[in-house]
């Protein structure tokens, strides 16, 4: 519970910073809601598998970002969230979309340059 609250606070703070720049109807709250079931997977050892609710959230997130601006905003939220999880398994974060059958042309990472997303 404390972990979820910490993640929620970090994502909310980052949303307030990123939202004015994104010019998108997309919300970081969407990221938090959709990816909350993934927290255990993101902190797990390598070769873990995301849960079905986690993958459902990843697919919902992809569907919620239909425009380039939305995708850039989603990327910025993912980037901020990845940087805020102290025991994040970077390999699991990068593998998450593929393990859930979602194709995105960037890795979920604290170092992703979201401004280059044009798909």
UniProtKB/Swiss-Prot annotation:
Keyword Disulfide bond: yes
Keyword Aminoacyl-tRNA synthetase annotated: no
Origin: domain of life: Eukaryota
Keywords from the UniProt entry: Disulfide bond, Lipid transport, Signal, Transport
GO BP, one annotated term: lipid transport
GO molecular function: lipid binding
Function: Plant non-specific lipid-transfer proteins transfer phospholipids as well as galactolipids across membranes. May play a role in wax or cutin deposition in the cell walls of expanding epidermal cells and certain secretory tissues.
Name under which the protein is recorded: Non-specific lipid-transfer protein 3
Organism expressing this protein natively: Pisum sativum (Garden pea)
């Amino acid at each position: 519970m404390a972990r979820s609250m910490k993640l929620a606070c970090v994502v909310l703070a980052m949303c307030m910073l990123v939202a004015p720049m994104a010019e998108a109807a997309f919300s970081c709250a969407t990221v938090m809601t959709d990816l909350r079931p993934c927290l255990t997977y993101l902190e797990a050892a390598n070769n873990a598998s995301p849960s079905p609710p986690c993958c459902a959230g990843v697919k919902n997130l992809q569907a919620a970002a239909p425009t380039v601006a939305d995708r850039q905003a989603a990327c910025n939220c993912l980037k901020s969230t990845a940087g805020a999880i102290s025991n994040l398994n970077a390999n699991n974060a990068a593998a998450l979309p593929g393990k859930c059958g979602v194709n995105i042309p960037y890795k979920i990472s604290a170092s992703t340059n979201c401004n280059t997303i044009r798909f």
